[in-house]
Design a protein with these regions (language model features):
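Residue-level detector of conserved, function-critical positions
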Residues: 22-244
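Charged/polar low-complexity intrinsically disordered segments
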Residues: 13-16
């Protein structure tokens, strides 16, 4: 949500996230009720690739759709499988296992995200990089922040500047902005302090599409974005015209 001139408004993206969260909650709630008839688990995650993460009293493992434990409850945390690998935590380190519970990528990361389109974001010594499914670095730990890939690009941050990289780890848009949002519908909202900390929109060629004049700018959804301008919260289209 946005707070603008003391008024809180729900954005389109906020509503989408809320709807998705509610759907996932009820799916997990129903699965939990079936799997937990004998009070075997204290928590259950979402089924993915035939398995769901579950928690006993303290530790996590995985069950199949017959609600049998197929990967022992031995982890500090376990996440839903993606692209054949499950992200798990052991001794406060993140690693990845396959459907049989075999370790495929060792436990050596301080933080990580599940695989998406053949790569995963991992953190080591306070910096984020990218690995492939074999655990090889596509991009060594380099950035202080790395957002989820959107439309093939990820927002990254280093030394209080942000830019964008591709899935090869190559810098596509230089780290020359002071703040930014992930790409959506071909455009990204970015902020430049030298432009009075105003926000504008760029395309994937780093060309300015909408000028740096907004106090607040959010990603586009269905060709509409919410912005703040001259003390007013409004919706604009991709030409910068206000939408009523």
């Amino acid at each position: 949500s946005l707070v603008y001139n003391g008024i809180r408004t729900l954005t389109t993206q906020t509503i989408k996230v809320m709807s998705s969260t509610i759907t996932k909650f009820f799916a997990s709630f129903l699965a939990y009720g079936v799997a937990n008839k004998k009070k075997r688990f204290s928590a259950i995650g979402r089924f993915s690739e035939g398995l769901a993460p579950v928690k006993g009293k303290i530790q996590w493992g995985y069950i199949n759709k017959e609600y049998d434990v197929v990967i022992p409850l031995m982890y500090e945390r376990a996440f839903s499988f993606k692209e054949g690998l499950g992200m798990v935590v052991l001794n406060s380190q993140y690693g990845f296992i396959d459907h049989t519970g075999q370790i495929r990528i060792p436990f050596k990361y301080a933080a990580a995200h599940s695989f998406e389109q053949e790569c995963a974001r991992v953190c080591h010594d306070g910096l984020w990089g990218l690995i492939d499914r074999q655990g090889n670095y596509i991009l060594p730990p380099t950035y202080s922040q790395m957002e989820q890939f959107a439309e093939g690009l990820a927002l990254v941050s280093l030394h209080n500047k942000v830019g964008f990289i591709n899935k090869k780890g190559e810098v596509v848009i230089p780290l020359e902005y002071d703040n930014g949002c992930s790409f959506s519908e071909g455009l990204a909202a970015v902020c430049i302090e030298s432009q009075s900390s105003k926000w504008g929109y760029i395309n994937k060629d780093n060309e300015e599409v909408l000028p740096f004049k907004y106090d607040i700018a959010e990603p586009f959804y269905n060709n509409i974005a919410r912005v703040g301008l001259y003390g007013k919260s409004m919706k604009i289209n991709k030409q910068g015209s206000e939408c009523l």
